[in-house]
């Protein structure tokens, strides 16, 4: 073994015993390696391993174990014996193994630990492979992981599981289309995000997104705006995932061209019930064959709640004794609102139905869906609108109608916002207004009474659902 003269005295003085012992071991069996000599070299009976040392390169040996024979490198680094496996003798030529042993000794002579050098090289190779794999990851692969996160995770904002409707929006807006429509004829259309599914994530640049927005906004601006918001949340999530981190270039939220192309998501001006339409609407909704859907739609209008908030109502959330309802709120977590007389009677009818599990943690508005609660009440609402000969009004339009119709009773804005679960918009509302339930009830009952009067409905002890 070659030892530089500058280190010779120091090494002999510091680890004299180790070097001498190691040299004796190497001198025990040293022969010039040949193919035939290595073939005949075997493990003696009763031993776990044995070594045959090369006469040409003193740091190279052939180690025989019960399973195989391999070339090994052995030397001294920092005063301690260092041994590394080079490879199986069937995979390495003798001259190549000698060259590798010389290379490893050269590293030691220059003060480098060969084990660390090897680990660094492996890490670099793995890093290059990982980067190569990253560039090949498509949008659809990462999107499926994101959907799984939505199904099993919780929202960082609300600290609760994501709603069924929110997850369904992601699925529908990324659907490739071509499936038979559940209602109507013909195949379904592809969602706005479908054109991105086969795209490598590394190509999801701000310029590409700007061009995508420019195309999609022409025929469906509001849906495209919604799809963009979902896409932006997905990109933010992916940048926090180790396997997707750093793949998507640029910042969509800060890119001028992207922000310029995002369509304005504006609600339709007529997506709201007018007071003169209330009579026709109630008459049609109350005549629906499905009493659960009928009650659901009426409660939605008379509470101003979000569609999923009412759909997720359980019997344990309804307090008939103290006339209150606990609503799972996406802003505050939950809110308590009054259980007004007409709504109370609607729910009483459902509670008395044979299949109701009012004494359990059952859904108020149950259905045959997988979750057990009402999922898609739009079809029932659309039938009622056709029957009433009214223009299309969305389920969210019923929530909008509550806030609009409340102005006829001159209800304070903060009262309506608290009932509907709107985020406080003023400093006083946010920090100082904590209205008791009785005060909310006073105004909420006024709103309900006015709406029912306009609809020509008289409150009785028992409400006729039909």
Curated annotation (Swiss-Prot):
Pfam families referenced in this protein's UniProt entry, alphabetically: Arm-DNA-bind_3 (PF13356), Phage_integrase (PF00589)
GO biological process entries: DNA recombination; provirus excision; response to X-ray; symbiont entry into host cell; viral genome integration into host DNA
Coiled coil: none
InterPro entries, alphabetized: CB (IPR044068), DNA_brk_join_enz (IPR011010), Integrase-like_cat_sf (IPR013762), Integrase_catalytic (IPR002104), Integrase_DNA-bd_sf (IPR038488), Integrase_DNA_bind_dom (IPR025166), Phage_Integrase (IPR050808)
Keywords from the named record: DNA integration, DNA recombination, DNA-binding, Viral genome integration, Virus entry into host cell
Domain called Tyr recombinase: residue spans: 268-445
Domain Core-binding (CB) stretches: 134-239
Annotated catalytic residues: 306, 328, 396, 399, 422, 432 (o-(3'-phospho-dna)-tyrosine intermediate)
SUPFAM superfamilies (alphabetical): DNA breaking-rejoining enzymes
Family note: Belongs to the 'phage' integrase family.
Free-text function comment from the UniProt entry: Integrase is necessary for integration of the phage into the host genome by site-specific recombination. In conjunction with excisionase, integrase is also necessary for excision of the prophage from the host genome.
Name of the featured protein: Prophage integrase IntF
Organism of this sequence: Escherichia coli (strain K12)
